[in-house]
Structures are given as structure tokens and as C-alpha cells.
């Protein structure tokens, strides 16, 4: 999995950093959780030598008594599961769903072999919500926050070791107040891949890549952090960019490093006749980095240059007009712990509607991002706290610092993906921001991203019911602005199509007046649909399809609009009591399925609705680039 810096959300227990030698665990417990022959990692990108830890024993602990029973040592029975795993994938509605939504505690146990004594890294892609990690019965570290990678290191003896993780996803409202509001069900567990690897005398971390086009060539700059775990010495990385018919060597300078020191080195190379990455041609190179005999890092990257001027977004010098849908990583029976087949299904659904872009409110799993890279689907990636519409909880200095660190962790971990074209800092900000803390977060994070990742846009997403008429300081430094538009659903659902189209055009004109120098995006539009409502009436499949057609035709005709995203690709579980929200104040006698957001183009089980056909016809008539 990608290299990343230690974050404020993960805490390593200090005694472990000094040394952690295997203690004797219960032989039966270790045997029960022993790893099957290691499979290939779900994630291509990352350091060399990783072994995925896939087979675990999981035990629910609703009374939170496992610690008192000594479960930190792995002495508990349970069910064998494959990680990534969600403990509470069902139910999501009714009384049982309401209880399930409140969260619980569970314990995971596995074992692995250290082939030789030395220093090892144990890396987690994600855990929801709080994770306590124990190795051979001793505390290794803690982490808080979903969809953020974290890792711990320990000195290990050769032989078998037992890894235990306690996961706590109780109190979803408290999660929101700590900067981790969830936009769908409160799934809990080890919802991302876990791996272990031995660390050599050096370690390569946080690689970066930037492409600048020059005539028929591409000038590529690659950076990587080199950490020295050996004695004071000089370290010289090597690298290359490789395609079947082309190999480009990367020449890094040697760097003098004290023991325990880290430095960033860069290499530049001119790539003649490059195979550029774009939605129309998603060509990929393999990036190979190494300190020979000590460490390595591999990823698939795309050479592409993203630029923007005023309201225009360009890739490789060509204007981009993007169309797609928002995605929630959620599949029946799996929650947000998606299998490779689940991720393939999401990409297939996006391609079936003709999408060349996708929006995500939460950081996407690295394996899904790799699939989007390969498919040529650009990503509007949400980072930082996700709040309810118009909300902002990160007001204390501690929470504000953590909010900024969320942004940095995600941007560092996902920085090599050519599909990501924008970092979205806030979801549905009201007006000019809720308070000075939110404004300060956006401005500070924008400056950091511009300094560390200047080849991507930084954006904010406006709550369409409360847009500003005059842009305040929260927008002064961002490059793009998005706005939700539920005209025809929450707003004016009984208007004629012509009246709705006029309202949409008026909204776009207002956006352009307020933000004349920003790239403009419609981040959400849509309507709930199922078979419970009369044909053609609000809540029916026909109503949804007709409304989406109206929106898309208006947006496609506006030359100043860069992107549009249907809300949402698939129906998904929200809160168990959700029944449409404020829509019942404007549409009487609407029938919706409790617990599900039904604005999807596909049902929760994956069946295409008529709107999917309508959207596909319209999207596929638009240019891919």
C-alpha cells in the first residue's frame, strides 16, 4: 500500500519503538488464526516485500469486556473472516438496523511469520472507527478515523507473531463531532487491507510525480523520501518509468544521511513521444524505485498535465468537460469493505453510463483508485472532514489541526494517481463558511496543497440552498467551486420542465457572476426513485429519468460549466430512520423505503433503473475529453 507519513490520528506505544520481542501466545489461538498462503496484495502501489494479512479470527464484544478477559493476547474464539471486513454488514433498517447503526466493539486476531529478526512495519489501509493494535500481547499503537492509512513499526524476533486489533465504532454522533461524519451507514471493522513487511537499511516513502509537456516530449519530475535506518552514510536511489515498448531511467542524486534521518530526492527525465494519460487514452507506466538490496517502491502512474485558466480545465492542453456520478463505497453484505469484484462492479457501472469522472465525499480505497486510473475515469476526491450540510465541528485547535492533517495524509497517500484531478476540502459549505475556523481550515489547507501538489485543483463544495452572492475569504485561494442543485426535487418539484430549466440556467448564471475566475462544477443533482410511487409522479422511475435528462441537457449546453455529477451511482443505506428527509414537506404522499437513499441510478442490489439508460444515452453523446 502507498507510503505515507505518521499522522496525528495514530499513536505508537513508545516501549514498542525501542524493542518488541515475541512473547509466548496461546498456541491454539495462533494456529487458529494462522495465515493461509499469502495472496497477492489487493493494492499494486507500495513498498516491496509486503505480505497481506488476509485471514483473521473476529469476535464481537458488545459488552466491551474483552480487555478484562485478556483478549489483547489473542485468547478468544471467533469466526474466521477475510480482511477487508465489516462486522455489521446487516441489518441496516428497522429496529435491528437502528441498534446496529449505533455501533459496537469487535476484536480481530491473526498471526504471521517473521522470516528473520529485524524491524517490521504493519500497515493498515483503513479501520472504522477507533483501532487499538497489540502485537504478542503488548500495545503497539492506536488510531482514530476511517479511510485514513496508518502504520506502526516494531523490532521482531524471527518466528511466529500474533497480531490483535480491537475496533470500536460506537457513538456515530461523536464521530461526526470529531471530524468524521459519515455520509452513509456506520459500518465498523477492518475495512481496508492490512500488510506486514520487513524494513531494510533504508526505506522509500511518499513518492511524487509531476509532468510538464514540452512539444512532443514530456518532462517528468519524480520525488521520493529516503529514510536511512542504517549508520550515517550516503544513499543513492535508482528508478525507472517502464512501458512494454519504452524504459526511461531516472537518475537520483546520492544523499548523505545520518542514522534515522530522512531526505527528499528528485529526478527529472525527458520522455520522448510519451504515452499520455487521459480519459480517452488512460495509458500507464510502471514506476520502479529502489535502493538496491535494501528497499523498493512500485506504482502504476500516468503522465498527464492538468492546468486551469479562469473557468477552463485542461488535460494535456485539451479542454475537459466532465460528466459522471458520486459513488459511495458500499455493497450489500460487505458494507464498505469492498472485494475486487465489488470494485470492478463500481467501475463497470460508471462505464455503462458513459462517465468520464466520479465524485467521492470520502477518500477512496487505493485499489479502487487504481481501477479508476486504468479506466480513465477522473476523480473529484473529497478530503478532510465530511460534515452535514452547512455544519462545521472542527472548531478547537486540536480538531482544526486534525482536520488539516486528514487532508495531508490523504493527499500524500493518493498523490500518484493520475485519475485524481481535484482535492475537495469541504462538502456543502453554507454561504461564506460557518465560522472563522472553517475559513481558516480551507485557506491553510489550500496553501499546503498548492505548495505540495501544484498540479491539482483545490476546491470547495457549496450547499446549493445557501450559496453566497458575494464570494468571501473562504473562496479566495481555491481553484474550483462546486454547488449542489436539487431543482425539481427538494426545490420546485411541481414546476414544468421549462420552468425547471429556466431555474437551473439562472443558478448557473449566478454561480458565474459570483465566481468569474473559478472552475465551476455541479456536484449533486437527482431524485429518489422506486416502484412504490405512481408512474411519472415524484418518486417514480420515470420522474427521476425525466428530471435527470432536464438537468444534463441544461448543464451540457453551458460552456462555462466544467463538470456535473449525478447523485448517486447506486442506492445505499443511510441511517435506519432515513425516509427522504425534507422532501416530505414539498411532496405529499411520497413513498420511500426507510433506511435507504434511493437517488441511485442503480438499486442497492446493482440493478439498473431506467434513469441509468437515460443518463447513458446523454453522457455517451458528450466528448470523453
Q: Where would I find each of the regions flagged by the language model?
A:
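Accessory beta-strand-rich segments of carbohydrate-active enzymes
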Residues: 37-38, 59-62, 98, 103-204, ...
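Short strand-turn-strand beta-turns centered on an Asx-Gly dipeptide
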Residues: 134-140, 244, 292-293, 316-317
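Bacterial N-terminal signal peptides
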Residues: 16-27
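Substrate-binding clefts and catalytic carboxylate motifs of secreted carbohydrate-active enzymes
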Residues: 42, 46-67, 71, 103, ...
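Short glycine/proline/serine/threonine-rich loop/turn segments at secondary-structure transition edges
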Residues: 160, 271-286
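Active-site mouth of glycoside hydrolases
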Residues: 148-154, 174-184, 306-480, 484-487, ...
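Solvent-exposed, conformationally flexible loop/turn segments
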Residues: 105, 158-159, 217, 258-262
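Beta-strand-rich binding/interaction modules
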Residues: 120, 133-135, 217-256, 263-266
